[in-house]
């Protein structure tokens, strides 16, 4: 794509632009969702996605691809806030964990089938079709949703929204700064990467705490859990292929195994279970990060199998904790649309931030002469620290049951 459009200077920008624009959109999506009826939101998000897809598909230059990616990111942020808010409004606290468990299963198929299918389409008819064809499925799916969207309870609200544009914009700016820094091999690039990671992480935490000031721990634990899990999966294929000399097929199998474990375990959430699944899940992700470290140290076939097993353990942990930690914030008295936007912001921002941490730090270290295995080991160690942090935050959270017992 970059070669055909003579746009290698902008090659890295579209990779980060979608996440950054989605984070920025989510920082002020709540007031929009509070004032605009659901059907109009659905239509607007769909139109934005189609416009972005058309711009990228018909791009005569790399700047058009960047613009289309930004617009699709805005559409994704708007719809993510709407969708999670709708779950909070339609289902009670007993049903929500089950719904969020199904939510993970729904995107499993696109996550597994999408990349190889797009690779085949690109090889067969070119990258423009690979970018454009999903828009057809999006329009069909949104049309089906539109037939039942009137079931979502909605009343216009004029009160204060959960995420503030100033802080949310700061998150987007920090991610953009860090993305630029990760692509710059100079000392200033490294400074920008570290600065973007530090300020971005602090701004994300500030957004979530301000959004639900009375009980932010479930939301914070959810964000840190997403960062630890998706950070590990960000480098899983790289660890197997570059670090251990395995094949693309093995790497794809490891990713698929982890995502499948997440989806299957998530189908049977255990609210109130012992041990607490919302604490056990991050604990399993921590164990998985240690297994990834061990796999890099073992090398050979033993290392490959250790990393594959670690991916599955991480998936089991995510399946245990994700449905609970993503549904518990709705126990707050805030409007469902506000809470849904905060949950979407937490996952999207944390995933973008950890992609910068994992991918950006690995690139920076590798570019400065580090061996791939040593660079991967350092990143996996940092991800283990994140998983341990998620365990600590989740263990100290105030669940609805604990709140009831205290009364």
Regions found by a protein language model. Name each.
Residues 45-49, 109-111, 164-175, 285-288:
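Alpha-helical transmembrane segments
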Residues 9-11, 65-68, 125-126, 158-160, ...:
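Interfacial loop-to-helix junctions that mark the boundaries of transmembrane helices
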Residues 153-158, 331, 399-407:
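Short, Lys/Arg-enriched, Gly/Pro-containing loop segments at transmembrane-helix junctions
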Residues 2, 84-92, 101, 106, ...:
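Helix-terminus/helix-capping segments at the ends of transmembrane helices and short amphipathic helices
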Residues 62, 180-185, 271, 300-301:
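Membrane-interface helix caps and helix-loop-helix hairpins in membrane proteins
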Residues 119, 123-236:
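Hydrophobic transmembrane-helix bundles of small-molecule transporters
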Residues 9-34, 39, 47, 52, ...:
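12-transmembrane solute porter fold
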């Amino acid at each position: 794509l970059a070669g055909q459009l003579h746009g290698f200077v902008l090659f890295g920008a579209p990779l980060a632009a979608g996440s950054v624009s989605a984070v920025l959109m989510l920082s002020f999506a709540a007031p929009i969702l509070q004032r605009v009826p659901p059907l109009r939101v659905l239509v607007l998000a769909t139109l934005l996605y189609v416009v972005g897809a058309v711009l990228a598909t018909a791009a005569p230059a790399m700047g058009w691809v960047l613009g289309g990616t930004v617009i699709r990111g805005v559409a994704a942020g708007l719809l993510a806030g709407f969708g999670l808010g709708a779950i909070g409004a339609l289902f009670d606290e007993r049903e929500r964990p089950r719904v969020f468990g199904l939510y993970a299963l729904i995107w499993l198929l696109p996550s597994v089938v999408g990349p190889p299918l797009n690779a085949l389409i690109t090889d067969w008819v070119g990258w423009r079709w690979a970018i454009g064809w999903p828009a057809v499925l999006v329009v069909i799916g949104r049309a089906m949703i539109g037939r039942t969207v009137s079931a979502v309870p909605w009343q216009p609200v004029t009160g204060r929204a959960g995420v503030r544009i100033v802080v949310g914009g700061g998150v987007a700016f920090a991610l953009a700064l860090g993305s630029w820094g990760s692509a710059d091999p100079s000392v200033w690039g490294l400074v920008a990467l570290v600065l973007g990671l530090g300020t971005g992480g602090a701004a994300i935490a500030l957004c979530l705490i301000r959004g639900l000031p009375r009980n932010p721990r479930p939301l914070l634990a959810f964000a840190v859990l997403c960062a630890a899990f998706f950070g590990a999966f960000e480098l899983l294929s790289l660890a197997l292929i570059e670090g251990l000399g395995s094949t693309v097929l093995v790497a794809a199998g490891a990713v698929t195994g982890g995502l499948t474990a997440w989806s299957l375990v998530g189908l049977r959430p255990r609210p109130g279970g012992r041990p607490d699944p919302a604490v056990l899940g991050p604990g399993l992700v921590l164990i998985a990060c240690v297994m990834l470290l061990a796999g890099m140290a073992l090398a050979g076939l033993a290392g490959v199998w250790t990393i594959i097993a670690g991916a599955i353990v991480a998936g089991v942990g995510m399946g245990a904790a994700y449905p609970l930690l993503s549904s518990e914030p709705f126990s707050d008295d805030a409007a469902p649309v506000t809470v849904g936007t905060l949950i979407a912001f937490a996952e999207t921002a944390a995933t973008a931030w950890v992609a910068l941490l994992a991918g950006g730090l690995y690139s920076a270290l590798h570019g400065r002469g580090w061996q791939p295995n040593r660079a991967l080991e350092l990143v996996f160690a940092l991800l283990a620290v994140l998983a341990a942090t998620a365990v600590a935050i989740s263990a100290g959270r105030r669940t609805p049951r604990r709140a009831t017992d205290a009364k």
